[in-house]
Amino acid sequence: MLLNQETNVTPKFSIALVNYKTLALTKTCLTLLKQHLDDGAFDANRVQVWVVDNNSQDASTEYLRSLDWIHLIERLPEGHEEGFAAHGKALDMILEKVQDDYLFLMHTDTFVYEPEVFHELLQKCTQKTVAVGCLEQLNRGYFKTSWRLFSRFFKHYIRRGKRLLGLKAREPKPWREQYIKSFFALWDVKWMKQHGYTFFMQNRIPTYALQDILETQEKYIHTVSPMWLFKFLDHVEAGTVGLVAGYNDMNRRVKRKMAILKKIHQS
């Protein structure tokens, strides 16, 4: 467990969020975090919340400007950017600013109900662990997760076999997830800065290049199961993409978002 031996408390940490035109999601996410601060689950002097607004120019920007308890960075892109690149560059702006050793990456469609999840992940971050996170973005349950792994494993090797025989087949995709996802992940940013690493590298999805690099280092990534993690939080999964893209009311992700928001309001 990461404890200060003199004070017997968990270390200071920061939380990083990137907003782009998602007022409802961002407001819900931040409202829950503020409740945890007000309830004393976090020490406000030991937890910093950083939010980058990616040039939304809408009501979500005005909302963020109205909050005096967050560190707001308003980012102006130099030109057209892919969404993942804009997100990665925004995370790196936070990385440059934070002074704490540990940084939690969150999405604005991640809603934390049980604040002890932050301390639980910090406990799993040992001296040789650079990151802690989950390979899946939602909890499908044990049966669906097992079936998904089996079907992807079967499809992967069927395609490989066909290509070895010279038959026409698609490129086999990895049968299991390779990277922890940034909807809720803890990173040892002190170690990252010491080695000159950032979240957005090689023009790839944020943290993916870094995770590949870690395979060559004597450092590790600790993974937690979705069944365990989702006891503490919910994640819409691409909720921000759905809102910006204008998914219709019947889209499954929009349905999930509305169900989660309804549960929050009822509680």
Question: Across the structure, where does each feature detected by a protein language model lie?
Answer:
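Hydrophobic targeting segments
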Residues: 11-17, 33, 47-51
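Short, well-formed alpha-helical segments that are part of the catalytic scaffolds
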Residues: 22-37
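A conserved acidic beta->alpha catalytic loop
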Residues: 52-62, 77
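Acidic donor-binding/catalytic loop of UDP-sugar-dependent glycosyltransferases
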Residues: 59, 110-123
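Active-site-proximal specificity loops/subdomain of glycosyltransferases
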Residues: 68-97
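Short aromatic/hydrophobic "clamp" motif used to bind/position activated sugar donors
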Residues: 103
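Conserved catalytic core of nucleotide-sugar-dependent glycosyltransferases
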Residues: 117-203
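C-terminal catalytic/acceptor-binding lobe
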Residues: 199-267
